[in-house]
Amino acid sequence: MIFQVDNNDVFASDSGQGIDKNKETIILLHGSGLSHIVWSLTEQYLSNQNYNVLAIDLPGHGNSEGNCLKSIEEISDWLEKVFKQLSISELTMIGHSQGCLESLEYSSRYSKRVKNLIFVGGSYRMPVNQDLIDLAVSGDDKAVQLMMKWSYENSKKFIGGNPVEKIINSSRDIREVLATDLIACNNYENGSEALKSINCPTLFIFGELDKMVNLEK
């Protein structure tokens, strides 16, 4: 699905189903530097469960036009424009990593639209290692390699291989936007206040071996 926001094309993968007003809608928000592609398997599964499912590419990511947005707050306001454009009045948001921060901030600003929240591998505060930011800013491939190591290194023990790496490598070169995304995560400080405004069912999903999230906090 392609539509326009702020005179730029926005892409949302919908499994070719479009939006059925008689179905509940689930929004999938990708993590730093990524795109709708990382949600491919999840999107297909949820679509088969009779939901509207939209895996949205943020500006400058995947197939969406425009410049990469520089703050979580800016992204949340952009998402509101998306949902208005698509006439979505109620939704469930599923965010991964940076997408958790976006879902959290969005729900604190536009709570009337949000029916459920699901946070996958994320928290209300996600400080980023400065060395990782520096590598991303310089365009060093090691930034991506470290993210893969810290997030998915042990996945082969459970799923017989790591399809996520192949999915990521099939996306637009994430080095173009990774630094901006990581800095946005690192600079986001409204999480604790935003949490107080949540008034809908909320699920947190964490990976015990995921080193990108501090489970102690």
Give the ranges of each region predicted by the language model.
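Conserved alpha/beta-hydrolase catalytic His-Asp/Glu region
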Residues: 134-199
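Short beta-strand/loop motif that positions the catalytic acidic residue
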Residues: 198, 204-206, 210
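Conserved alpha/beta-hydrolase "acid-adjacent" motif
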Residues: 211-217
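Conserved acidic catalytic loop of the alpha/beta-hydrolase fold
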Residues: 73-91
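Residue in the alpha/beta-hydrolase core beta-strand immediately N-terminal to the catalytic nucleophile
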Residues: 57, 92, 115-118
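Conserved HGGG/HGGXW glycine-rich cap/lid loop of the alpha/beta-hydrolase fold
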Residues: 8-65
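Conserved alpha/beta-hydrolase "nucleophile elbow" surrounding the catalytic nucleophile
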Residues: 30-32, 91, 95-97, 207
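Flexible "cap/lid" loop of the alpha/beta hydrolase fold
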Residues: 101-145
